């Protein structure tokens, strides 16, 4: 995996999650907008953190990017669980 493709993956996956949050907030104005806003802020922080880490690899690049990819999916999954909790209220 090269760096350019990885950065595009970060933009796609985090961007899609933010789009899902915004769509839910638009379709459900009666739900708690503050919680959705907080989840979006966490997603933006994740995006910035992943981009920063991708630009400054440490050690073996292949192992580093593999671990960073795993971290990205784990954190996005955690954010999805938070969004699901808000949706189910």
Predicted feature residues:
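N-terminal acidic leader/helix
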Residues: 1-31
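Low-complexity intrinsically disordered segments
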Residues: 35, 41-89
């Amino acid at each position: 995996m090269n760096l350019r493709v990885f950065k595009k993956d970060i933009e796609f996956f985090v961007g899609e999650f933010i789009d899902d949050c915004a769509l839910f907030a638009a379709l459900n104005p009666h739900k708690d907008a503050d919680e959705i806003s907080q989840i979006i802020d966490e997603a933006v922080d994740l995006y910035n953190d992943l981009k920063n880490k991708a630009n400054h690899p440490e050690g073996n690049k292949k192992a580093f990017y593999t671990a960073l990819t795993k971290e990205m999916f784990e954190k996005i999954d955690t954010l999805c669980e938070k969004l699901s909790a808000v949706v189910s209220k």
